[in-house]
A protein has these predicted regions:
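Charge-rich, well-structured scaffold segments of protease-associated domains
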Residues: 4-8, 23-26, 48, 53-56, ...
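Bacterial N-terminal signal peptides
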Residues: 10-20
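His/Glu-based metal-binding/catalytic segments typifying zinc-dependent metallopeptidases
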Residues: 58-62, 69-71, 249-308
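N- or domain-start disorder-to-order transition segments that initiate the globular core
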Residues: 28-64
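M16/MPP (pitrilysin/insulinase) zinc-metallopeptidase core fold and M16-derived inactive scaffolds
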Residues: 67-129, 189-193, 305-321, 513
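Bacterial N-terminal signal peptides that target proteins for export
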Residues: 2-11, 512
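N-terminal mature ectodomain segment of secretory-pathway/periplasmic proteins
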Residues: 486-489, 493-534
Length: 534
């Protein structure tokens, strides 16, 4: 009994001590972050074939699957009056080989439950690891022996034209066309626009010439991830890919864009719009691996990288102008862009632009708080850590390191670089990459409701959906003193007056539609007794 009492006393003392320690913690302050740890990044192996093809292998035996991506590292291309032929050539790669028709190729891929896709710079294949050899053999056949027949070319062209037609009234597609053309210029690979006319001018020979010029092993890389062994992969690629012949590929050089001289408004009138698509930005030069990237990434999280950003909290949470407002930036060996964007109601378009400009200026001239910086860093580090759970991330790191000549420990030191970003760094990159007086404000919306109030932000220029300059749309305005009743009465007088309307006893409507599968048009007639208007 005495022992029990002593135990109770010791327990009470321990609890009191723990409570006292707990009570001393000031929970109004964020705990100090520990030093950034070096991430545990998975390993990869690399080998190179005699033809120059470089292959990166990430072994992961958790699941019996494998994925392969072949990347052709060519410079951007200016396609001119045949814009679209590069994309079409990439599509044709997956439409059969000289040894397999398209139907045969599709049948073999489907039988394995696999996936195969092609583009103008890549071939991707994935499936069960027991089919690894078959997938390598098919990938090799596609990249070395594309058929590119006239029949498949005609089909691809028809589908391409159909897609362009569907994008003509899509506000997002219109914005991509116009913003890109005005930021980079139409005589730049990133600014030219694919149209019906450019696609119609493409020939099968154009697509073949593209393939023959750029699909070369000495400028290509392959990443393989999954349940495979390096020794097996080496054997398969030597067997199936060694026949791919190397050749010299000419590089391209393009001048930097200089199209934006001062902040201005570019407006595309879309009369059916009930909301405006807004994009505000400027070109930037930021190559992969640049020392500014980490600070800029922290800055972008604070400004508009998500729901914690200034733009989101201002335009959505505070003003309720939109469901979300964000910002983003890109990296590119040539040139890229920074921009902020949202979709807002017509009635608040000018107010939204004002808030965008306010937040961009605040980012350039103000100083981010310690709490904002800590949250942004935590978000970036958390995303990075989660990405390491995917073996494909390791393959991506390997490819980027090779493609952009990054230091071998670039990703190993990533968290340390993010942790080292300061408030001064954030302000410096904000001023460097967000233009204060050379912003392009691009809006796709209903000109009648939106355009007249935008002149205060800069000179307004009007464009069609392909970034061609147009005249300002005519805005109908109600003459002073005219009411809705005046308009209705004017219409009634124009058709004969109240006496004529009163004599109408019935009316009918006839509607006709043609539908696939019906032997004849569908006709509907509706007759109604006229209402007593007076």
């Amino acid at each position: 009994m005495i022992i029990m009492k002593k135990s109770i006393i010791f327990l009470q003392i321990a609890l009191f001590a723990a409570f006292a320690t707990f009570a001393q913690v000031d929970r109004s302050k964020r705990p100090e972050a520990g030093a950034a740890r070096a991430p545990e990044i998975g390993k990869y192996e690399m080998f190179e074939l005699s033809n120059g093809l470089k292959v990166f292998v990430v072994e992961n035996h958790k699941l019996p699957r494998v994925s392969m991506s072949l990347i052709v590292d060519r410079d951007p291309m200016l396609e001119g009056t045949k814009a679209g032929y590069v994309q079409m050539a990439g599509d044709l790669l997956g439409r059969g080989t000289t040894t397999r028709s398209k139907d045969k190729l599709d049948e073999e891929v489907d039988f394995m439950g696999a996936n195969l896709s092609t583009s103008s710079t890549s071939i991707n294949a994935s499936g069960l690891s027991k089919y690894t050899e078959k997938l390598v053999e098919i990938m090799a056949d596609v990249v070395i022996n594309p058929a590119m027949t006239q029949v498949e070319f005609d089909k691809a062209k028809e589908q391409f034209l159909s897609g362009i037609e569907g994008e003509k009234d899509d506000a997002g597609s219109i914005m991509n066309n116009v913003f890109g053309a005005l930021i980079y210029g139409k005589n730049h690979p990133y600014g030219e626009i694919i149209t019906k006319e450019t696609v119609e001018s493409i020939t099968l020979e154009d697509c073949k010439n593209y393939y023959n010029t750029y699909f070369k092993p000495n400028i290509s890389y392959v990443a393989i991830v999954g349940d495979v062994k390096l020794k097996t992969v080496k054997k398969l690629f030597k067997k199936y890919m060694s026949a791919w012949k190397p050749a010299e590929v000419k590089g391209e050089v393009y001048p930097l864009p200089t199209s934006i001289q001062k902040t201005a408004v570019a407006f595309v009138d879309r009369p059916s719009s009930v909301q405006s698509v807004i994009r505000i930005g400027n070109p930037i030069v930021l190559k992969p691996g640049d020392a500014d990237i980490d600070a800029l990434r922290v800055m972008n999280i604070i400004l508009g990288g998500g729901s914690m950003g200034h733009l989101y909290n201002n335009l959505r949470e505070d003003k309720a102008y939109t469901y979300g407002a964000y910002s983003t930036f890109g990296t590119d060996e040539l040139v890229s862009v920074f921009y902020a964007y949202a979709q807002v109601r017509n009635a608040v378009t000018d107010s939204a632009v004002q808030e965008f400009l306010f937040e961009l200026d605040r980012m350039r001239t103000g100083e981010a708080s310690a709490d904002e910086i800590a949250q942004a860093k935590a978000s970036i580090m958390g995303s990075f850590g989660r990405s390491l759970e995917q073996p494909s991330t390791i393959a991506g790191f390997a490819l980027n390191t090779a493609l952009y000549n990054l230091p071998a420990d670039y990703y190993q030191n990533y968290l340390k670089r993010v942790e080292a970003v300061t408030a001064a760094d954030i302000q410096r990159v904000s001023q460097k990459y967000i233009s204060g007086d050379k912003l392009l404000i691009t809006i796709v919306g209903k000109g009648q409701d939106v355009a007249p109030s935008l002149g205060r932000f800069g000179d307004i220029a009007y464009y069609d959906i392909y970034a061609n300059p147009t005249e300002a749309p005519s805005f109908l305005t109600m003459p002073e003193g005219v009411t809705a009743n005046d308009v209705i009465n004017g219409y009634i007088n124009a058709i004969g007056g109240k006496e004529a309307v009163a004599k109408i006893t019935a009316y009918s409507m006839k509607m006709e539609a043609t539908m696939a599968g019906l032997p004849a048009p569908l006709i509907m007639t509706i007759s109604k007794r006229a209402p007593d208007y007076y």
